[in-house]
């Protein structure tokens, strides 16, 4: 069958439903401790879904994406999001940078409130269970084996919180144990804190 064209649409029904009905129940938002005005760096922007939900909760999000193709798709999605009455105030809090996240973090002058890394794609077998946009996303990203280096770079910024989204089963912690975890059906969030005693 023909592959449907991949389009990033922040006005899409499913995403709007999650925005309207997820709220504090959205585990992602609990993991990043989402608050209005909070500065979040999303190191693995991908299709922008997580960044959009963070921005919808009031966070200011910098999206880092190293794939030029995905960055173009994201730029297009953000452009159309600025025209939608439901999404324009949300995407106004989203800034896209096409870059290598490790290099970008190495130049970061001021620690962020939260740095977010999504490790849901590495080492996952090609199967019928990975569909549509996700399949195409894997094609663009390839086998992303640099999560350990990315986590080390994120921790080196001295940001208040680093959150890594991993597969529930088989998601290696790269030898760096998190301070705590939040678990969902198919994934978990490993959370690293700069000052654990204050949380």
Protein language model regions, located:
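A short, acidic, amphipathic alpha-helical segment used as a generic capping/interface helix at domain edges
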Residues: 100, 104, 142-155
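Conserved beta-strand/loop positions that form the S-adenosyl-L-methionine
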Residues: 43
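Conserved SAM-binding loop of SAM-dependent methyltransferases across substrates and taxa
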Residues: 47-59
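Conserved Class I SAM-dependent methyltransferase catalytic core
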Residues: 147-194
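Mobile active-site "lid"/loop adjacent to the S-adenosyl-L-methionine
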Residues: 119-150
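S-adenosyl-L-methionine
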Residues: 1-40, 56, 60, 64-114, 198-199
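Conserved acidic residues
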Residues: 38, 113, 160
């Amino acid at each position: 069958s023909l592959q449907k064209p991949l389009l990033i649409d922040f006005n899409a029904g499913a995403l709007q439903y999650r925005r309207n009905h997820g709220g504090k129940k959205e585990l992602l938002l609990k993991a990043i401790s989402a608050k209005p005005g909070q500065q979040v760096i999303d190191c693995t922007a991908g299709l922008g879904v997580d960044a959009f939900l963070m921005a919808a909760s009031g966070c200011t999000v910098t999206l880092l994406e190293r794939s030029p193709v995905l960055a173009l798709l994201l730029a297009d999605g953000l452009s159309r999001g600025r025209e939608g009455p439901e999404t324009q105030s949300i995407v106004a809090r989203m800034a896209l940078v096409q870059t290598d996240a490790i290099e970008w973090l190495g130049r970061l002058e001021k620690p962020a409130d939260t740095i977010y890394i999504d490790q849901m794609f590495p080492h996952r077998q090609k199967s019928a269970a990975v569909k549509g946009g996700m399949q195409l996303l894997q094609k663009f990203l390839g086998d992303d084996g640099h999560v350990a280096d990315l986590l080390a770079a994120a921790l080196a910024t001295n940001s208040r919180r680093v959150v890594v989204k991993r597969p529930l089963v088989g998601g290696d912690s790269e030898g760096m144990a998190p301070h705590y975890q939040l678990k969902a059906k198919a994934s978990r969030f490993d959370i690293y804190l700069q000052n654990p005693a204050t949380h």
